[in-house]
Amino acid sequence: MSESAKAAAQNGQAEEQQLQQQLDEQQQLEEQQQLPPVTIRIPSPTCSRTVPKPKDSTEPLDRITLYPQPQETIQDIKLLINDWVGAYWLGPYSLQLPFVKGEDGRGKIYSKKKDFSEVRAGEKLNEWLEVQDAFEHLQEGEERVLEAVREPYGELSARQSIIRLLELIAPSGTTANTTSNPLGLQAGSTIFEQVRDGLVSANAETTYEEVEVSLPSGRKGKGGKKELVKVKRSVSGDKAHAFADWKGWAPASFGSLAVSSDPVEVAPSLKSIQISHFNPPPPHLRQKGHELYLQVSLLEGEVVTLICSTRGWYVSKSNVNNFDPSPRPSADGSIPAPTHSLIDLLHSISPLFSERVSRLPPISLDGALADPISTVAIPQATPAYPFLTSPPKPAISPEILRTQLAFLHTGAYGPDLVDAARDWNEEIQGIRELPRGTMQERVFREKMLQKVWAEFDQAAARAVQAVSKGDIPPINPAEDPKAHMYLQSNIFITQGDSDALDTYAHLGGDAAMRISHGKDAAGVKLLNKIDADGLYLLGHTIVDWQGRRWICQSILPGIFSNRRAVEEEKAQAETEAEAETADAVEGEQKKEDWVDVEKPTEKSGSETESDNPMMIYGLDSERPTSVHWDAATHSLLSTIATPLRLAAHTIKDGEGKEHEFYASAEVKGLKGQDGRRYLLDAQRLAPVDVEWLEKDITGPLVGPKKDDESAEEGVQYPHRLVMLRPELIEQFWESELKRWARGVAEKAQAKKAEAEAEAAAAADAEGEKKKEGEQSEIPQEEQSAAASAAAARRAEEDRPVDASLIGDIKQFNLSFNPDAFVEQPVLEAEGQEGKTEIKAAITDESDPSVKAVRDAGLFLRQIAIPAVVLDVLTGNTSGVMDGESLSKHLHQRGVNIRYLGHLASTIIQFSTSKDGAAKEPSGHLAALQSIVLQEMVFRAAKHILRELLYPLQPETATDAVSHFLNCLLGSCLNPAPVASYTPIGINSNEPEPAYVKLTPECLRAQIIKEVKSRFRWTLDESFLESGLRKKQLLRELASRVGFQLAQREYVFSKDQEEEENKREENIKSKEKKKGSKAGAKGETVKRTTTFEGEDVLTLVPVIKSTAPSVSVAEEILEAGRNTINRGKIEFGLDFMLEAIQLYESIHSVIHPEVASVYNSYAQAIHQIARLKIQQIAAQENPDPEQPLGVDISGALRFQRQAVAIAERTLGVYHHETAGYYFQLAMLENLEGNAQQSLRYFRHLLTLWDVIYGPGHPEISTILSNAGIVLQSMNDLSLSLSLQKQAYESTLACFGPNHIQTGQSLHQLVQGHFLAGDMASALETAKQALEIFKARLGEEHNQTKEEAKNVELLTAVIENQERQKEREEAVKKEATERLKMARERIGGGAASTSRPTGIRRLGGAGAGALPQGVRVVDPQTLAALAAAAGQGGNPSANAAAATAGQGEQANGESTGTPQIGERGTESLEELVRYIQGSAPGVGGSAKRGKNALRGKRRTGAKR
């Protein structure tokens, strides 16, 4: 059974088929409605320079042909026109059908719409009109033409023209863009293009190479002098690959780490532009059509004032000091007419403007300055802010228009003209009420919802900053400051970490309040995902900034009303007669219908007692005995009960009356004055973790304890608001469903006839076999009792079930009571006034829904947590690199972060030996343990830092952060750092903040205490001193707490300080040698601490949105995956591409969800391609050129975009970005782009170093894959080096006998084999074989494969040995024959005198022989050559060829070649002579070497 459970066995496939049918119908509809092209006629500009001449002279610039899609509107067409080079300059215009005179003298009427609008020829088309509706009157085949017609200006269109001009001359991501005002520095930066182009090396330092350049000597008549100079040159593929300088693992330097790309250099097109100070136009000039005055400083040095009238723009006679609205005459004295387009006018008055603008998109014919995905603004996602950055230089660029942007967008000159802020609530709820019956309606609705949620999040962050600084007064100034509420930009803002009203005093006070708001936001996000019709939720966002948590919500209509809602009472009286039909309100959508509700009479208290008359459902938190109930709201809540697995249960009010609820009674329903029903306080949509309440609030610690720590076991958990995660509820539900299905199947099998008993037994045996096979996945050396038990449970749960025996799946029923074990304050008996008792009202576990809550808590401890560790142990979990990735993984598995201590304890249990002896974790478990412990420290430190920052002013916060970091991370360098604090000085009694007194010892004690309290774990103090990965913890603190550090190398220890000092000394010495003036600037002051206040540049708000994922695209994406899993690959990929288009349409491309779906598609293509490669390789006669049939190039394009988007929205050094880079590197290698693949692998190693550091097992995988890529490039030496490093890393992580070590050795065998080192390959293969035999058994496929490798390598080496023996035998035989020949010749050769002349073979003269020369027969010479040549020495073979040539040179041969009497002293010398190394011959070795090299080819030819 799949993880989606057999619950989908009957209806899941039907739903998928229904979705597929819906998509097919939509596709058929689109094919039927494929629109013919539409030609847009564009007017001509007044200036000839406005539109550049195209490279292709046949391309017209007065018209553009577009191919609209169905449902595209006139507004969509205008957006396309605005980006075209021939129409970028247009001012306000409308699209019209060509004029045809009608009967009434106006344009001819072509059609009338239901909304009474008309489509007339020659009149402006409604921008929301669909394009196809504009041409309903045309027959098929007729030309479709629209005309862009200039429209008169208003103030709005004048301001829009200026904004359009700014977008043109100051594109996003360029140096010209100086008007942006982000929340942090270098928002949304990316380095992907640098990595792609090889501009980022391992340490991000610029690579230099020496080249010769000609420098002028200054002398007349003489050429320049060539001198070696250093020139910056990027490492690119035409010189060397990314690993060419790889020497091994080297930690990345923070000081030179690549964190962002420099903005594209763009020359300014105008000196300045600003709204003229003569604005607004006076009444008499406004009456003449004046709309706006604009002051522009041209590059030519002239400052002009442009006046916008209803007819267009013109240059006035005004100057900076005097206003004259008269048009400035032309050079010939004539008065020019206004120019309709502002951009066209600037072209006509400034040639330099035309020149500069022609280099910018969309006018430039050379393409974009940079990849748009790296530079365009991020519309619907929070940009990532790098944790390291450099302040801009200069700190701020002068830009007057930056202060006038508010006017450009609002048109308000004063507070009386400011438009009311956006009504966020009405926008959100209005979009919710849009129709969603068809796929197109759903897409449009979700697109609008995602857009408004993103804009709400950004507005909330801005509002929180204003509130936190004290710029916004509270709306309840008389109350406790912790209870202050604020209203800014129509956003209701409250503090989320103070329980000022003691609402959660019984659950933990402020700590419980903070958790409650986090759970509330999660509940709102979950309900937004469910999107139940008729249930409304406020816009909701959490913003954490400078130690405080702020809750931002849209305003509930009527929440600030102080009078009784007389209208509601009247409406209630009118609908009392219709109370019996109130249930029908469930499916209605009109607001008027929401009035038809039952009279909420079932309350414990009267309406006069209620402080909130809007509340109609749920438990009143201010009056615990008051319960509100409303039938219509209850009916609506039943729609969310099924997806959330909620059980119907009853709650008693103060009068003992019972009311039925689905969600917790603490989830409140309020009826706004707009008639809508809203849900608030959604924190209790999941049940309570009763196991934690009973065992871990004050229970014993699960971590290792010292002998003297028995008293510490009672450390109190900070709060009692502990709940299970919805993911765990779903997992437990699926697990119970499988167990129920197995029980039903077993009962059905038991009832079968005896004839089927044998078949049933065989099926059981097969199941047991699978169970044993799955258990064997764990290496035997790691089969601790805990691991074996977890594996057995996993195998039992995955045991297949015969679905035909189950019957109706609806018989299974499991739901949870969210009010079970919920603690509430209860007043005690009389006589004990003021005293309350905290107890739960629902605890009867005989109720299945209550017992299910208990069982779910046990499932979390006994099944879910061990399953997490088991998957890590067996290698089924990857990508857990840091605390953030760990938290995300645990949440997906339903494990709360408070269980980190239990998770660490489980790791220790899984690491014990088979006999139960304690053993240090290794491999993946060791890495997981390191991440878990560091995450405990991080979260404890975050809570402490938050408390320190809470009361501080912004200017003091940076000093507090730097001192905190010194105490946490810099104590090895300076054990007693002194805090920097400068009082504001306004109040003489100003108290000293708490951070000033913080010391490293105090901080370590607080962290240990926090870890004990929050995670039930005893943290060893030595871990804080030597176990922390400090650079990685610094990155996480900056990224997740929200602050940016100055980019520099931070020194954490004395040893590192010494290394930095040596490096600086080397730099200074080099500068002195070069005569650099750097030393004249003075010595830099030596730091005494790791961090200083100036290092903390800014604190960035952390936004937690409640916007859910896109459900309509998610459904199609999941359908695509399921289709691929069923073997229909082509249809599945089509589904995934359809989902990608929807994600792009809804999220506007640059969004983390779009990056995720890009990666999913590329990963699917990669897996399919690998599978097809295996299938081709398994064929009898495989064709390596056979196409795979998948679009790898398209997948590469998506994956590259995914990386860039992830860097901009998640972070350059984020765990998901690293995963995308790995997938990209693998795809590049699959496509054959080895150079690119190596660049990404090299950068991936840098990412791992920054995120985790060295020593993680997954780093070995990267090194191994890079080595395989190098093998394809024939760089076998470096490939072998990387394979060895991968093996050494694996050996260090897992030990010598681990299965992973065997796998690494198996990879290393191939490296040795390709390098030609057969002996090492054989030895490595034998080591791998021993590991596989011990861990997998001799019958395992991998063991058999390795045994074959050993057998083949042994055969190769034996063959080499036999060849060597044969060569030795031939050489020995030749030596014997030579000896016999010498004996036959006589004793002349026995002379011991050294020759004085030059030895040579052959005769001198025409057959005449010198005196005393003896003859050697040809057989002897051949034997001599064999003795030197059979050994495989190429020099000897060449010498034999030389001897043969010498004989031919003598002309006639005697037939008995002779050797002189003193020709040699011994056999060895003779052999050496033939090999060209005879002693006593001057320069013979050198000459022989060169001569043999040259005659080697001649001999080969002969």
From Swiss-Prot:
Name of the protein in question:
Clustered mitochondria protein homolog
Q: Which PANTHER family match?
A: CLUSTERED MITOCHONDRIA PROTEIN HOMOLOG (PTHR12601:SF6), EUKARYOTIC TRANSLATION INITIATION FACTOR 3 SUBUNIT EIF-3 (PTHR12601)
**What single Pfam family name could you report for this chain, choosing any that match?**
TPR_12
Q: Does the keyword Zinc-finger apply?
A: no
Superkingdom of origin: Eukaryota
Q: Where is the composition biased (Basic residues)?
A: 1486-1502
Q: Which GO terms of type biological process are on file?
A: intracellular distribution of mitochondria; mitochondrion organization
Q: What cellular component GO annotations does this protein have? A: cytoplasm
* Annotated region described as Disordered, given as residue ranges: 1-62, 571-615, 755-799, 1054-1085, 1381-1403, 1429-1502
**MF terms in GO:** mRNA binding
Q: Where in the cell is it found?
A: Cytoplasm
Family, per the entry?
Belongs to the CLU family.
Its taxonomic placement starts with: Eukaryota, Fungi, Dikarya, Basidiomycota, Agaricomycotina
Residue ranges, compositional bias (Acidic residues) = 575-586
